Curated annotation (Swiss-Prot):
Keywords: Chromosome partition, Cytoplasm, Cytoskeleton
Top-level taxon of the source organism: Bacteria
Pfam families: Bactofilin
GO CC field: cytoplasm; cytoskeleton
Family (UniProt): Belongs to the bactofilin family.
Protein's GO biological process: chromosome segregation
Entry protein name: Bactofilin BacO
InterPro entries: BacA/B (IPR007607)
Subunit structure: Interacts with BacN and probably also BacP, the 3 proteins colocalize as an extended structure. Interacts with PadC.
Disruption phenotype: BacP, ParA and ParB-parS are less organized forming smaller, more dispersed patches, PadC still forms foci which are mislocalized. In a triple bacN-bacO-bacP deletion ParA, ParB-parS and PadC are also mislocalized, nucleoids are more compact, DNA origin regions are mislocalized, DNA content increases. The triple bacNOP deletion is synthetically lethal with smc or double scpAB deletions.
Subcellular location: Cytoplasm, Cytoskeleton
Principal location class: cytoplasm
Length: 126
């Protein structure tokens, strides 16, 4: 029996977000705690706790987040368990899984995305 290593195949979303972000949490990294910052963040690994960013968060297909999220924009292709508050937009990509409430003025849910929770798009708080 021979072993042939498989190379990682990244979707166009994953290639684009990895190139755009200043900070990437790799697929073998696990963080338990609070993350805060002023720049974009890509999560390919696992984050538990709380995430607070002034810019955008990208959760790639391999990413697992068990945290409340507060940021400007969120794009999710992986799994998120926790409440999401975005000042601009939340986008759930095909095959993502999200469990928690979403509060944002704009929300996009792709065909094939899984979402369980409540949505609040209250325009008064913009």
């Amino acid at each position: 029996m021979s072993f042939t290593p498989r190379t990682a195949r990244h979707t166009p979303f994953e290639r684009r977000t990895t190139l755009m972000a200043n900070t990437v949490i790799g697929s073998s990294i696990v963080i338990d705690g609070e993350i805060s910052g002023d720049e974009d963040l890509v999560i390919q690994g696992t984050v538990k706790g709380k995430i607070s960013l002034k810019e955008s968060l990208y959760v790639e297909g391999s990413g697992v987040v068990e945290a409340d999220i507060e940021t400007q924009n969120v794009e999710i292709a992986g799994r998120v368990t926790g409440n999401i508050v975005a000042s601009d937009k939340v986008e759930l990509k095909t095959d993502c899984r999200v469990v928690g409430d979403i509060k944002a003025p704009r929300i996009l849910i792709a065909d094939g995305a899984s979402f369980k929770g409540n949505v609040d798009m209250d325009m008064k708080e913009r």
